[in-house]
Design a protein with these regions (language model features):
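Short alpha-helices
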Residues: 163-188
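Rossmann-fold NAD(P)-binding glycine/threonine-rich loop
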Residues: 124-167
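Conserved acidic residues
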Residues: 62, 115, 138
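C-terminal substrate-binding/catalytic lobe of Rossmann-fold NAD(P)-dependent oxidoreductases
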Residues: 36, 47-51, 55-107, 194-195, ...
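Rossmann-like NAD(P)-binding element
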Residues: 91-129, 142-148
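Glycine-rich Rossmann-fold phosphate-binding loop(s) that bind the pyrophosphate
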Residues: 42
Length: 344
């Protein structure tokens, strides 16, 4: 089966399972427990997380926040998600009503009715938000944008799921760290040790963001190493990794150039590495020369062609013909859709 068919099958399986879950078992599940979820920050990541939560039988969205009345509110209304203001300021809350939206209160009001909050707000406001969540006595998850030191726990499903069970709160690591973990953790689990050097070729901004750049430059991240590689060690400390990064004028995806040093006696070949990744969820491997998918533009077109919502590609995209193991050194390229790979 080709990858195009494989991707469609994955989507169909998800849809079928959702139908089954929403069928005869739904009432039974709802009788047991429904987790009330708040989304603080209904933007690029928040709207995707909200839909993922809404698809679950044992969870419900009790509210999403916006800083001000804007076009994102229309989507929340269509989805049936109650709107709250990010702030508790009376005038800011009233602005929603003046713009024609029903606003159910401020963030404090939302936290009072939630069991857990998923924080999808911009970075650098996490510390103050965390204080509010702790005071409200609810669980919390930060969707990237914050440092491990602030949250004390980090999470990605491919690396440390069980270690995060029962904690008061955690952060989902960034899109780049998530992507690195997806392909590096299987290698580490096979080899027992791993040393990695990688370069992040980062998109300048998300497609819907008109305020960032560069638009006519290549901008190196002059903090060395960049945070992406060391962040992998917050979810899998045993992997030794460093990274550097540059931002380029595109909005589509990030690309990683990875050089991994495997231990002596690893027993792997290029083919067995590809087979290992093929067995993992959320990794798509395609041959660029055979398919014509040789750039991130075609990868995103592929995601649209298979009918993905918002044109998302939740999987990490690996070019098969860009993978080569020579002795103990593994070279490969992978592409990361920054808007969706961190979504549950």
């Amino acid at each position: 089966m080709d990858v195009f068919s494989k991707a469609n099958v994955k989507d169909e399986l998800c849809q079928n399972q959702r139908c089954v879950n929403r069928g005869s078992s739904r009432a039974y599940v709802l009788r047991i427990m429904t987790i009330k979820v708040a989304i603080n920050g209904y933007g690029t990541i928040g709207k995707r997380v909200a839909d993922a939560v809404d698809a679950q039988d044992d969870m419900e969205i009790v509210g999403v926040t916006k800083t001000r009345p804007a076009f994102g509110c229309d989507l929340a209304v269509r989805k049936g998600y109650p709107i709250f203001c990010t702030y508790d300021d009376v005038d800011r809350i009233a602005a929603f009503g003046a713009a024609g939206y029903t606003c159910h209160g401020g963030l404090s009001d939302l936290l009072e009715i939630a069991d857990i909050v998923v924080d999808c707000s911009p970075g650098k406001v996490g510390a103050s938000n965390k204080d509010k969540y702790v005071a409200a006595g609810i669980k919390w998850i930060f969707q990237g944008g914050e440092k491990h030191a602030m949250t004390e726990h980090s999470y990605t499903s491919s690396a440390n799921h069980t270690e995060n069970l029962g904690v008061a709160g955690t952060r989902v690591v960034s899109c780049n760290t998530t992507g690195l973990s997806r392909t590096l953790v299987p290698l580490y689990e096979h080899c027992g040790s791993l040393s990695v050097e990688c370069t992040m070729i980062r998109r300048a901004a998300d497609p819907g963001d008109s305020s960032k750049g560069p638009i006519n430059a290549i901008k190196p991240v002059l903090k060395v190493p960049s945070h992406h590689g060391p962040d992998v060690m917050t979810v899998k400390p045993e992997i030794q990794i460093n990274s550097m990064a540059v931002a380029v004028p595109t909005t589509l995806m990030h690309v990683h150039v990875v050089v991994a040093t495997l231990p002596e006696g690893h027993g792997l070949t290029t083919e067995s590495v590809l087979s290992m990744w093929n067995e993992r969820p959320r990794i798509v491997i395609m041959n660029g020369s055979e398919t014509g998918i040789t750039t991130t533009a075609e990868v995103m077109e592929f995601a649209r062609d298979i009918g993905r919502k918002w044109g998302d590609l939740h999987e990490i995209f690996v070019w098969e013909d860009g993978v080569k193991l020579e002795g103990n050194t593994l070279y490969y390229f992978q592409a990361i859709h920054q808007e969706s790979d961190v979504i549950p």
